[in-house]
Swiss-Prot record:
The chain crosses the membrane at residues 5-25, 39-59, 63-83, 102-122, 134-154, 171-191. It comes from Escherichia fergusonii (strain ATCC 35469 / DSM 13698 / CCUG 18766 / IAM 14443 / JCM 21226 / LMG 7866 / NBRC 102419 / NCTC 12128 / CDC 0568-73). Part of a membrane-bound complex that couples electron transfer with translocation of ions across the membrane. Required to maintain the reduced state of SoxR. Belongs to the NqrDE/RnfAE family. It is a multi-pass membrane protein. This is Ion-translocating oxidoreductase complex subunit A. It is found in: Cell inner membrane. GO terms for biological process: electron transport chain. It is an enzyme of class 7 (translocase). GO terms for cellular component: plasma membrane. InterPro entries: Ion_transpt_RnfA/RsxA, NqrDE/RnfAE, NqrDE/RnfAE_oxidrdctase. It comes from the Bacteria.
Length: 193
């Protein structure tokens, strides 16, 4: 049980996918201008990343390795992610039309999020079992969502702040992301993986 807790804390805080591994920077910078959109993208990404990690592990373990098709791993995982995103879109559309309208634009964007593919590939490279793969995918998504929501809240405050002209827009956003990355480096001694 302690190993799973360490995996969760290590993935969310110490080895954050956005601030440490630099995966998922496109939605991190693009969707984080408003807190509501960042929260919606975070929820959708959490669901997709967790489910894609599980499906990718199952396909790799039950199909690719037994048939010696490991060279198709990246292509297979991209297809798995696309199918999971489409499945998620269909389920959300049928079960909650309000949530579908809220997340409508974000669901197709998750297909191109490199963090989702990165989690699936890292699960295999790190030799995780089924439970570890599911937890790693969920933890990476929680870390992604946490950082994106924090960044969106900071950007909303910066939008009304008196920022010097050369630093307005993307410049102050990149400086803020760098400072957040430095702040998360403070967690580096917390867990040794």
């Amino acid at each position: 049980m302690t190993d799973y807790l360490l995996l969760f804390v290590g993935t969310v805080l110490v080895n954050n996918f956005v601030l440490v591994k630099f995966l998922g920077l496109c939605p991190f910078m693009g969707v984080s201008k408003k807190l509501e959109t960042a929260m919606g993208m975070g929820l959708a990404t959490t669901f997709v990343m967790t489910l894609a990690s599980i499906c990718a592990w199952l396909i790799d373990t039950w199909i690719l390795i037994p048939l010696n098709l490991i060279y198709l791993r990246t292509l297979a995982f991209i297809l798995v992610i696309a199918v999971v995103v489409q499945f998620t879109e269909m389920v959300v559309r049928k079960t909650s039309p309000v949530l579908y309208r809220l997340l409508g634009i974000f669901l197709p964007l998750i297909t191109t999020n490199c963090a989702v593919l990165g989690v699936a590939l890292l699960n295999i490279n790190l030799g995780h079992n089924f439970l570890q793969s599911a937890l790693y995918g969920f933890s990476a998504a929680v870390g992604f969502s946490l950082v994106m929501v924090l960044f969106a809240a900071i950007r909303e405050r910066l939008a009304v702040a008196n920022v010097p002209a050369p630093f307005r827009g993307n410049a102050i956003a990149l400086i803020t992301a760098g400072l957040m990355s430095l702040a998360f480096m403070g967690f580096s001694g917390l867990v040794k993986l």
